[in-house]
Amino acid sequence: FFHDKRGGYIKYANAYILPNDDICMEQFTADTQDEVCFFTPMEMFSELTKHCYVSLATFQKKDGARRDFNVFNRSIMYVDLDIHDTAVDCEAVLNQTALILTDAYNNNQLPIPTMINHTGRGLGIFYILEHSINESVPELKKTRLAFDGIYKRLVKKYQSLLDAAGITDVHADFAVLDKTRLVRVAGTVNPNNGKVCNTIFRNED
């Protein structure tokens, strides 16, 4: 994930929990050389209260690049519902959106998600698969195509429900279809409005 530190960004690619519960983070620098940083759990918690993102996919350790060719596995369909107009009453619009979505879930118009985050100015909706999909195994080509097709239709379905309900201030962001997409980490602050990203729904089934 990325986080700001002294005004810049540091990119950590892999995380390992050590036997003593410390956390080891492998950092890729600009010249793709590895650097290793260690955090205690409390130090990591402190870091995670900052401006942090996490990738939806895992990446191969070829050169540390967050690019399509470097994607290793995908296991999440993420729907990003955003409010871009800063003049809009964000909470009122999101409450209205939540009612529409709840009705859609209850009436089987949409599959119930794994988790929903309030991102500060929108909703981040996660569908986490039971098994990840490898990006490089040739035998899984049809599975990958099916994943992409279902994912695109899912995002379109969210947008069509918003349109049908007359909600014009919230939009489904189709940029989430990018394999290298980053999403905000729950518990961190959205610097655009100072609000904390919170998990507001978690499917326990």
Task: Name what the model sees in each region.
Residues 1, 106-118:
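Short, glycine- and small/hydrophobic-rich beta-strand elements in well-ordered beta-sheets
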Residues 1-76, 84-92, 181:
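DNA replication initiation on ssDNA origins
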Residues 6, 109-110, 176:
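Short, structurally constrained coil/turn elements
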Residues 43-45, 58-98, 130-205:
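DNA replication initiation modules
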Residues 95-107:
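Short amphipathic alpha-helical segments
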Residues 105-110, 162, 166:
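Glycine-centered loop/turn motif at secondary-structure junctions
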Residues 112, 121, 181:
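Residue-level signal for beta-strand positions within conserved beta-sheet cores that form or flank
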Residues 116-131:
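Short, conserved phosphate-binding/catalytic loop or strand-edge motifs used
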